[in-house]
Amino acid sequence: FCNVVRHCYTIPDDFVEMNLLRFPGKNLMNKLQDAVLTLYNYDDDPDNTDVYQTLVKGVNLLAKLPSIACYAYQSKVHYYDRESLFIHYANPEYSIAENFLSLLRKDQKFTSKEANLLDTILMLHADHGGGNNSTFTNVVIASTGTDIYSTVCGGIGSLKGPRHGGANIKVAEMMDAVLAETGGYDADDKKIRQSVEKLMAGELYDRSGLVYGFGHAVYTVSDPRAEVLKACCMEVAKEQKHTRELDFYIRFERIAKEVMEEIKGKALPTNVDFYS
């Protein structure tokens, strides 16, 4: 299976130049939707929805989307953020996670621990049943008999939402606000506690009263995905000398649960978005 996926890494001729470099996107999720719909035009029989053809087309999309996502990102940061542009070819010897890291970095260098962490993140975020929003969206659209490109495009649109796939971006932004409020990674527990109280009172970050990265509709006691990611993060943090940053997250996690229990009478479990 891995060999089949790697054989499909190659992007169609002129696709990157015509669709990604000439028309950069402000938002990567929207650009991915655009790219998926464009791939429809490169398929000789795009509306064929029999089981075998759907499998072939699905694997083909699975193999190509990581490279397309990286190229869309490089185009975006070049045209909108005024950074240098560099485009690398996908390496057929690499896994999807390894190619992500190679394509995103100017020197294409990465460590095995970094690749393992990203691979773990990809697995933990993969479809875990038909009930989550984007997968359910896929099922609803596919039930009409439409093509897989239209179906996947709809799922990406759902995944973009801040209450679904965009939730970990909210965590990152929230933690940046907390760091600014507390004065940095070496802030004492009292300052972290005050920032959590402000978040819950709607006085910090987006003033929603939410502490992002906590709570889950199914994992009401603990989210095993968060525990797995936390352990992987520890390995990479030690290797990359980011232990101060990780320690801050761990302290925030502990204190946030304490404050939630005091204010709401119940501590919400850390979810997969917090450490991702």
Give short role names for the model-derived ranges.
Residues 1-276:
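Hydrophobic alpha-helical bundle cores within soluble ligand-binding/oligomerization subdomains
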